[in-house]
């Protein structure tokens, strides 16, 4: 589907096509916030962490693979003018990648680790095209207040943490858990606005405001 925010949004060339390789409504909203015209195509890849893989390497690999997967699905003639943006986010505590919770117990365990502590959120972006791959990783430090088990259980019942890396969504109810954040808020949500705008500008795309 095509997602547009207004009529003036366009690319510098009508031959260029931007595709977001994600089914995340949060990433779609963030990219639209920058004023780009783009289509959305979900990417289905294996997200298993490889042996001895660091969180940095993991998120960057997934961002690239998501974008490459979508590019490979396109008819060969379309690949010449298509640019696919992939992104991946992981919550990391003491070097351990904290995935999405399978159940309430898993959520309680994860948020108990984060309670009263600082953790890192790593978000990678990658732009894949016929010209190659460009990507980077943004690291943000987040500190939580101390949480009670009752608070965590109540949070689980809201349904918000059930599809979130690290068992929380900073843009929602869990925003009240955050004491401090050092880095990019939008990266924690799922797509770093500044870095994404820079990446797309360098590829020749123009949003609401041309970024240099």
From Swiss-Prot:
Swiss-Prot/TrEMBL site (Important for substrate specificity) positions: 26, 89, 171
Major localisation: cytoplasm
Reactions performed catalytically: dTTP + H2O = dTMP + diphosphate + H(+); UTP + H2O = UMP + diphosphate + H(+)
Keyword Hydrolase appears in the UniProt entry: yes
Cell compartment(s), UniProt: Cytoplasm
Cofactor: a divalent metal cation
One annotated Gene Ontology cellular component of this protein: cytoplasm
GO BP terms in the entry: nucleotide metabolic process
Active site: 88
Gene3D superfamilies assigned to the protein according to its UniProt record, in alphabetical order: 3.90.950.10
This enzyme's EC code(s): 3.6.1.9
Keywords for this protein: Cytoplasm, Hydrolase, Nucleotide metabolism
UniProt GO molecular function: dTTP diphosphatase activity; UTP diphosphatase activity
Family annotation (NCBIfam families): maf (TIGR00172)
Family statement drawn from the similarity comment of this UniProt entry: Belongs to the Maf family. YhdE subfamily.
Function: Nucleoside triphosphate pyrophosphatase that hydrolyzes dTTP and UTP. May have a dual role in cell division arrest and in preventing the incorporation of modified nucleotides into cellular nucleic acids.
HAMAP family: Maf
Name by which UniProt lists this protein: dTTP/UTP pyrophosphatase
């Amino acid at each position: 589907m095509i997602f547009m925010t207004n009529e003036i949004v366009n690319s510098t060339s009508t031959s260029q096509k931007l595709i977001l390789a994600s089914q995340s409504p949060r990433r779609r909203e963030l990219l639209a916030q920058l004023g780009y015209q783009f289509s959305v195509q979900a990417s289905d890849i294996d997200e298993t962490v490889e042996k001895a893989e660091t969180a940095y390497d993991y998120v960057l690999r997934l961002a690239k693979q998501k974008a490459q997967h979508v590019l490979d699905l396109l008819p060969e003639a379309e690949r010449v003018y298509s640019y696919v943006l992939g992104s991946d986010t992981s919550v990391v505590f003491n070097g351990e990648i904290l995935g999405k919770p399978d159940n309430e117990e898993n959520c309680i365990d994860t948020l108990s680790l984060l309670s009263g502590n600082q953790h890192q959120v790593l978000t990678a972006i990658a732009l894949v095209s016929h010209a190659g791959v460009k990507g980077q990783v943004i690291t943000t430090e987040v500190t939580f207040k101390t949480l009670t088990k009752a608070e965590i259980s109540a949070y689980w019942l809201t349904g918000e943490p059930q599809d979130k890396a690290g068992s929380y969504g900073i843009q929602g109810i869990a925003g009240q858990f955050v004491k401090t954040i050092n880095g990019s808020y939008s990266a924690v949500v799922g797509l770093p606005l500044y870095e994404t705008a820079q990446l797309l500008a360098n590829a020749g795309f123009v949003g609401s405001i041309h970024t240099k």
